[in-house]
Amino acid sequence: MQQTKQILVIGNGMVGHHFVEQLRAKDPLVQITVLCGEAQLAYDRVHLSGYFSGTSAEQLALTTEEAYKASGIQYRLNCWVEQINREQQLVVTSHGGQFYYDELVFATGSYAFVPPIPGNDQPHCLVYRTLQDLDAIAQSAALSKVGVVIGGGLLGLEAANALKQLGLQTHVVEFAPQLMAVQLDQAGGQMLSQKITELGVQVHTGKATQAIVAGAECRYQLKFADGECLEADLVLFSAGIRPYDQLARSCGLAVGERGGIVVNDQCQTSDPHIYAIGECALWQQKIFGLVAPGYQMARVVVSQLTAGGLSFSGADMSTKLKLLGVEVGSIGDAHARTPGALSYVFTDPRAQVYKKMVVSKDGKRLLGAVLVGDTSNYDSLLQYALNDMLLPKQPEQLILPATSGAPLAALTLPNSATICSCHNVAKSDIVAAMDGGSCDLAGIKSCTKASTGCGGCTALLKSVVDDELKSRGVEVKNHLCEHFAYSRQELLHLVQVGGIKTFAELLSRHGQGLGCDICKPTVGSILASSWNDYVLKKPHVGLQDTNDTFLANMQKDGSYSVVPRIAGGEITAEKLLVIGQVALDFNLYTKITGGQRIDLFGARLEQLPAIWQRLVDAGFETGHAYGKSLRTVKSCVGSTWCRYGVQDSVGQAIAIENRYKGLRAPHKIKMAVSGCTRECAEAQSKDIGIIATENGWNLYVCGNGGMRPRHADLFATDLDTDTLIRYIDRILMLYIRTADRLQRTSVWMEKLDGGLDYLRKVIIDDELGLAAELENQMAALVNTYACEWKATLDDPQALKRFRQFVNSPDADENIVFVEERAQIRPATAEEKRQWQQQIPVTEIAVKALAEEN
Amino acid sequence: MAWADICAFEDLVENSGICALLNGQQVAVFLLAPSDEPQVYAVGNYDPLGNANVLSRGILGSIGEQIVVASPLYKQHFSLTTGQCLEQPDVVIPVYRVKLQQGRVWLNAGQQNQQASAA
């Protein structure tokens, strides 16, 4: 080992901080000293405009002084470097402090460029770069009505957003003929102007500001080269950045002609003991003004100072962001400057969406793209560009609206795509596992750990594995599992055609082995949606997942959460009191869910019947939060109360929730009803979304949130309630009959041959002549609904299962709670070890039980 | 090792599990009833991967020739005869001897698989 080195870092912006953090993680011993020019340590400059919409300086902070101290990082605030003596490897600060270094890192960043316009130095002419700048802007804004940003680039529009949030009438002045000239082409820039103008920001392009003089109505007047002028009280310069390289110049390091400290692939300057990273560094005549390349440089230098190996090889400058609420994306050669490049353009003037794709001369590779108003294609386009993937035969499909249903093509995902985020498993890891001989899901799961965390990626993983197998020429059978050589849809037909009522019967007639945790719940669901038997009837008990068995949601410590149904999110004060009292009596943790109801956590198995007895007595029913079934129908308050509502969305939501409650399906189903086009119930993110119109209801289908969000598609417009319900009946029943296990409506519809159009033909035009049958099946299910908790409470045999031990009244000692924010939470393993003796919750619970009995 | 009377045969749930307390240890007892000959299995109730006492609430089944229970938390499969986790073979849960006598279920506190760690 060498002796401990002294590493000195000048600058503590995002990149400087990242460097310090990474270096400390790699080398716990090295001496790190940071000289920071600002009054506080690093903060998030990317989200600076959030400062005006309520994000505090503390929230923007990327670290704290305590954290630096705790990791043994020396730092000085408000500390400016005066001089660097390279021979003695010594840095002198303006306070006279001297710091010796073995290795010196410049992370000085950049400053806002103020164009040399006469009058640019007046009091209310400001820049937008640091937290101090922001405080100055806020002070000035308090005394101003109109603000103008000079500069219509990415940062300029961010600054305009800040002024708008401060309540100023906002203008943007840009010298170039369009906004964001670096990232967007002309048409994209125009679409962006149009959208931003509609949001209340006035855009003036092609304007060269020549002077800032006293104004007539406002504080100042901007005089433009074309003779026109614009009045404003506050002028904000955001006309680009310049690297902070004066210090490097004065100590004789090589700098670029137009600024920037010259670095090589190791981010070394012309002095091998001095590095430069982030926006102050010039690599191959380029300055990278984004945070990701800066971070990359930081990691390169960390690697140089520790193990070595990494080098900087440039960075992709593609960006996707939201400016003033408008989605904007830019990838690679956005301007089609590559010789022979071809462009595909899609414009939707109504929705104000502009998309352009730049492809190579032979149409095989994606070179660049511009997206304005809708960046939903950004990720896949970026993957095509970054991975140099072969484009599909009709590349325009990639930017056209997905009317024909763009399939979830796992095969086209790049190898670098993350499949399981819990265990950080990329597609390449899965392919490697298959190369290594694993060729079934179970094997791949066990060797990659994919899908063994939260399990949210199960369907995607299967899709990747299936596609990969297919591409290797292996015939992929859509078999449910090793026990049944049938798909879910085929099994459903076997059950319905054969009148099969139990798993044992199905297994003996069509399967083999004993079954497993895949086929049993699937068949349980098929039996339930075919015959609507009570799910805990004796032959069905062993089929259900624990959540269905105990009609509650198991949590990480083996305790359960309880969710009573609150249809449409409407609840009386009396019922709220009941929930509150139950939570108090059983010491449960309460949380409001996203589906407008209340989740009660921390119930132990043996408490569930007593809890539900109280809830059922008060008129509650089970909320099926545990089932692959209808969860909630969310609603906004609708025309009853809202000034804007045009229909009674709450009444409709309640009616629909009560109609479909308990319906067992291949996956969970969520719905929502909005009372007007403002869409406060977020219906377009649901499997079934309903939005009120003046004339009735618009029906949206097959949306979802979650891991792979998808907007619902507009299915039919201005329906009366009767037609609306009939369409939903048909769609849901078709989904239940034909979808795969754990397939949400979105993927189901996308995989239907013909997609949305086909679905319309079957549901609306009844081309298959199925409509009446589907409606009848649904009617049978609706008519036989019974609350499972009520049935369970009436069944002494079923109740016997709700005890921890068959031979003891004791509780599970491993379930221990501690208090946090005045409620319980599960104790951590460490806490359990420490407080093994005191188990207060058990006592409370036992007392509650005793009172119940 | 002594046998302990745990419960009546009727207390078992067909093709599912219950949990019993045996000298302070939680034991999951399963009744597999595919045929006329009922088979009873007993393993530790503690899921060492999910760190919770939940295995008695898992789904029973078979993977190949192995009779298994799937953990309700993260779905790993444990063999009911060897206690071994199929996905992570280095993880083994205790397996207990169990017998049916005069309509009662008996457990033996001595673990059947010695390689299982007591933790």
Residue ranges and their predicted role:
Chain B
Residues 1-66, 79-80, 92-119:
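N-terminal pre-ligand scaffold of iron-sulfur
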Residues 47, 71-74:
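Short cysteine clusters
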